[in-house]
Amino acid sequence: MEASALLSRPGESEWLQLGDPPVPERLLPKGPGVVIGSGGSTGGRRLCLQPAAHLDRSAAATADWLRSIGIDPAACLTLNPLPMHHVSGLMPWWRSRCWGSPHAPLAPDLMKRPEALVRHCSDLPDWQGRVRLLSLVPTQLARLMGQPAAEAWLQGFAVIWVGGAALPA
């Protein structure tokens, strides 16, 4: 289920638990938030408790940074090939939600097929006319590099965030 649907369900726990095993309710901080996995790229999976207010502040700080380099966050299209049950997949969606801008999830298999990826993205309704942002992990970036169609696609982004592990030297 999409995180946006879960976050809007009234009467449910204030904490959306996207990680396993679930954290007992008595251990959760006050206020709404997300329990999510982190650290998968380095092997040591851990659960993170992310209060919604912290996620909102992170999105606001990122918006401030984008504005400082001349990009209006509300005018962006954020593409996201990362799973929502990881911090790196949740944050692009969360930022888009806070900025009032579109978020386009990308199926992970598209990242392995550059021609299909380019076709898919060019068919997105917001592809033309919006500043494009992308989040990926080093493995995805390494797969795309050296492939002309993928490199041309990457060059169409104003910002590419790479996280989750160190970049190869």
Please tell me what each predicted stretch does.
Residues M1-R26, I160:
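ANL superfamily adenylate-forming
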Residues D20-G37, I71-L77:
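Conserved pre-ATP/AMP-binding loop-to-beta segment of ANL
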Residues G33-A60:
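Conserved AMP-binding A3 loop
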Residues S38-S41, T78, W93, L134, ...:
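Conserved S/T- and glycine-rich ATP-binding loop of Class I adenylate-forming
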Residues A60-A75, H85-R130:
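Conserved AMP-binding/adenylation subdomain of ANL enzymes
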